[in-house]
Amino acid sequence: MKARMQTADIRKQWEGAAPGWAKWEPTIATWMEPATSAMLTMADVDLGAEVLDLASGAGSQTLSAARRVGARGHVVASDISETMLQHVQENARAVGLHNVTTLAGAAENLAVTEATFDAGICRLGLMLFAEPAKALAAVRRALKPGRKIAVVVFTTPTNNPFMAKPMQILLRHAGKAPPPPGQPGIFSLGASGVMERLFLASGFVCVEQRSLAVPLRMPCATHALEMMREAFGAYRAVVSDSPEVVRVAAWKEVAEILKTFETSTGFEGPAEVLVAAGLKPP
């Protein structure tokens, strides 16, 4: 019951964030390009492959995968938000890609045929799933033997200060505690050893990992604030049930902390992600 409640809450928060995420998708795509490229390579996304993309969002990494696999390949974009998937379809049509289809639902309960996919990918979604181990196990069943999944997650609060400090501010104003270990959260899978243990517990082997610095560069802190308020569902959700006066005060303080990351050339937010991959045993 608890997992179902979490899933419903996650669906609600991302349906609400979908328009903002789609608006900022080009910025997010540029920001995460090094991580996306590494993820696709580590998952062995090659020409002609059948790829499952979990938590696709508006689909910039879906389209990157679709270009890699070519006309003989195929990418299934899956997301808990049907609105997100509408954006995936629109974005694919806009660039003339016809090898993308969508599948709505929580990653833990996807209706996919066993052993049909050559690769699985998930960029910045796994740490926010209600049951990440269950989601990975579902992907393992969907993969052909000897095939891989690769994911991107944020590492630690220390290495992602422009994201960690605003979250701390929002939680404090809302009177809420950070998610306890094992619960969905921005940094829940980023500590040393966590992803490897999760992959192994989910039945994967030959786990590979690499950390990447992915600083967010924008013209100014105001742009970073707008993106955070409009697109980051986990941040929006923290104060969504707070009185307006609390929300206003919280976001005002967030704006002030984001300004501390401005330089002479604009906003630069230090960020780090972990790209991890696991192999389904042959």
List each model region and its residues.
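Conserved class I S-adenosyl-L-methionine
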Residues: K2-A49, S60-S64, M84-H87, A94-V95, ...
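Conserved Class I S-adenosyl-L-methionine
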Residues: K2-I10, W24, I28-M32, S60, ...
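A generic alpha-to-beta junction signature in SAM-dependent methyltransferases
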Residues: A43-V45, V69, L143
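Class I SAM-dependent methyltransferase SAM/SAH-binding core
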Residues: E50-L110, K134
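Conserved hydrophobic residues forming the short capping helix/wall of the S-adenosyl-L-methionine
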Residues: V69, N91-A92, L170, F199, ...
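A short acidic, Gly/Pro-enriched loop at the edge of an enzyme's catalytic core
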Residues: E108-A119
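A short SAM/SAH-binding and catalytic strip from SAM-dependent methyltransferases
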Residues: D118-A133, T155
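Conserved catalytic/acceptor-binding region of the Class I
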Residues: A133-K134, R140-P219
